[in-house]
UniProtKB/Swiss-Prot annotation:
Gene behind this protein: rpsC
Domain of life, per lineage: Bacteria
KH type-2 domain ranges (all copies): 43-111
UniProt similarity note: Belongs to the universal ribosomal protein uS3 family.
A Gene Ontology biological process term: translation
Protein name (database record): Small ribosomal subunit protein uS3
Keywords: Ribonucleoprotein, Ribosomal protein, RNA-binding, rRNA-binding
Organism: Arthrobacter sp. (strain FB24)
The keyword Ribonucleoprotein appears for this protein: yes
Length: 277
């Protein structure tokens, strides 16, 4: 049976970017690739435990030689910052103890939480934990996302839905969710609801539209600032103007030389070759 690949990994370099930005080629203990991966996992686990009410959508990690930068994208920055920055200082201290390096902590607010798949999945899971009917929670989340501007949304819940003896999966979809279109900007989120009768997994796909228009705008804005190169030749980026090669009907008229000149050119050619020899 068919399986669904993670939309973020499927579109890396096209519509999505890595959430960890660093490079490791050292063989020293603590600076190897596997050490950094383990450290990233622990940092994200630290952000997820005890911060459920903060609505953390994404944690980005960037490393330099002696510093680690952690960007927290949250729907409620006040909870992460705390009173007079006390909570932010506590998080920074725990991160410095975990990494052993200086930590730069940036707290960024999510402007539209209804369009963030991770936050939508977390919201549905919290309602399931509060014994809200799963169909009502799913449909309410889909309506909120569509009002916020989503072109399509799909929500899937798996587990002992409604406390049933047999676990099953159910999903609802509104609008278009083209999972195989690489230019489609699709956000994906997953969260687990811990209920009294077991865990229920919630998956959310949100289709925000194609990125072609955005890419064209970025290319148009970056075109004047480029240096000299093949792409700066006049008329070539658009593909419509190719200079003399465009009008092929003009060539016969230009090549129609008098017949009397042809023997003279041919006769002069051996003399030139003999002179060079």
């Amino acid at each position: 049976m068919g399986q669904k690949v993670n939309p973020h990994g499927f579109r890396l370099g096209i519509t999505t970017d890595h959430v960890s930005h660093w490079f490791a080629d050292s063989t020293k203990a603590g600076q190897r690739y596997k050490d950094f991966v383990r450290e990233d996992i622990r940092i994200r686990q630290l952000m997820s435990t005890g911060m459920e009410r903060a609505g953390i959508a994404k944690v980005e990690i960037e490393r330099t030689r002696d510093r680690v930068r952690v960007d927290i994208h949250t729907a409620r920055p006040g909870i992460v910052i705390g009173r007079r920055g006390a909570e932010a200082d506590r998080i920074r201290g725990e991160l410095e103890k975990l990494t052993g390096k200086q930590v730069q902590l940036n707290i960024l607010e999510v402007k539209n939480p209804e369009m963030e798949a991770q936050l939508v999945a977390q919201g549905v899971a919290e309602q399931l934990t509060s014994r809200v009917a799963f169909r009502r929670a799913m449909k309410k989340a889909m309506q909120s996302a569509q009002r916020a501007g989503a072109k399509g949304i799909r929500i899937a819940c798996s587990g002992r839905l409604g406390g049933a003896e047999m676990s099953r999966s159910e999903f609802y979809r509104e609008g278009r969710v083209p999972l195989h279109t690489l230019r489609a900007n699709i956000d994906y989120g997953f969260y687990e609801a811990k209920t009294t009768f077991g865990r229920i997994g919630v998956k959310v796909w949100i289709y925000k539209g194609d990125v072609t228009s955005k890419e064209l705008a970025q290319q148009a804005a970056a075109a004047p600032s480029r240096g000299r190169g093949a792409s700066d030749r006049p008329g070539r980026p658009g593909g419509a103007d190719r200079g003399d090669r465009r009008r092929r009907t003009d060539r016969p008229a230009a090549e129609a030389a008098p017949a009397a000149e042809a023997p003279a050119v041919e006769a002069a050619a051996p003399a030139v070759e003999g002179g060079q020899a």
